[in-house]
Amino acid sequence: MHSRKSKSITGKRKQVGSNVTRVIKPQKTRRIIRRFHHLINKRQSICKFLCLKENLDDSNEEKNDKIIRLSIKGNVRLGKYYEDGKSQSFNDAMESQLLRLHSLIKNESKSKDTSDLAVMYTLLGYIMNQINKLGGLETYQIASQNGQLKERGGDTSKLLEKWIRSSFENCPGAVALEIGSLSSGNRISRCALFRNVVRIDLEEHEGVIKQDFMERPLPRNENDKFDLISCSLVLNFVKNHRDRGAMCHRMVKFLKPQGYIFIVLPQACVTHSRYCDKTLLQNLLGSIGLIMLNSHQSNKLYYCLYQLQVVPPQPSSFSKRIKVNDGPGLNNFGITL
């Protein structure tokens, strides 16, 4: 008789102790990745507000729980709020508070009284429980890797190869940087156009270095720069419009003269945003020296390829968000420089 534990997360039965690769259904992968990033970002904001002495480790939730408990050691009341949050299943009230977290932190940053701490530790407990129910880092990594499988249509670099092949076929020494890499087996790594592909991500995978691009040391010389930078489904996870702009600026610093940047965004970022559309994005990137060579919009994604100009870029007029659309149901994705 099969136990419940002998099932994989897809519901298929699996031998206990086997090395069978767990597979997540394609319709679930993007939802899991998005949910994981949402929870991690909210947790980081709360921990920064609470000034925890030790940074959390997204790969070790048991350790994280101990760090949080240590921060409230001796405070029975805050411990109770934390446990209360951990006991709550998914609910609209808590999700609503997470969506309003930035405003909550802004309003409470001056006081940090007992009621403020109670709210934050309750939310922190809720997030910890949600991450645990999601399956933690292991499930996130499986979802990420499944999303890159060729048979699931998840490799966004297939279109990139088509666009750049003629430019790189006769450049044997070309090097590329893939930000937010999910797999060492995607097209950018297998197309044989690059002497070396440096793959980085916030989480370590096989063939992928654990590194935050914003903390990567700046190039010391041209040899440290890249002919191509791929930034696929990364900018949309950066927490605010200013940080997205800072990331765009930083990518330019890593490019060789006339180097290329490949950007992929969820389609909604340029079709259903109050502060961004395809024209604004093109003009904004143009202001930092990037000209668009190709673009493509699918049912769910927007792909674009830019090249660094030789001429100096124009002064930026994108220091504030510009409303380009208005109405219900729009998101607030935007980029400022």
From Swiss-Prot:
Pfam families in the record: Bmt2
Its EC number(s): 2.1.1.286
Main location as per UniProt: nucleus
Effect of inactivating the gene: Loss of N(1)-methyladenine(2142) in 25S rRNA. Confers anisomycin and peroxide sensitivity to the cells as well as slight defects in ribosome subunit joining.
Compartment(s): Nucleus, Nucleolus
Catalyses which reaction(s): adenosine(2142) in 25S rRNA + S-adenosyl-L-methionine = N(1)-methyladenosine(2142) in 25S rRNA + S-adenosyl-L-homocysteine + H(+)
Keywords: Methyltransferase, Nucleus, S-adenosyl-L-methionine, Transferase
GO CC annotations, alphabetized: nucleolus
Disulfide-linked positions: none
Species of origin: Saccharomyces cerevisiae (strain ATCC 204508 / S288c) (Baker's yeast)
Coiled-coil intervals: none
GO molecular function, one term: rRNA (adenine) methyltransferase activity
Function: S-adenosyl-L-methionine-dependent methyltransferase that specifically methylates the N(1) position of adenine 2142 in 25S rRNA. N(1)-methyladenine(2142) in 25S rRNA is present in helix 65, a region that accounts for most of the intersubunit surface of the large subunit.
Record family assignment: Belongs to the BMT2 family.
Name under which the protein is recorded: 25S rRNA (adenine(2142)-N(1))-methyltransferase
Positions annotated to bind S-adenosyl-L-methionine: 180, 201
Further details from the record: Present with 623 molecules/cell in log phase SD medium.
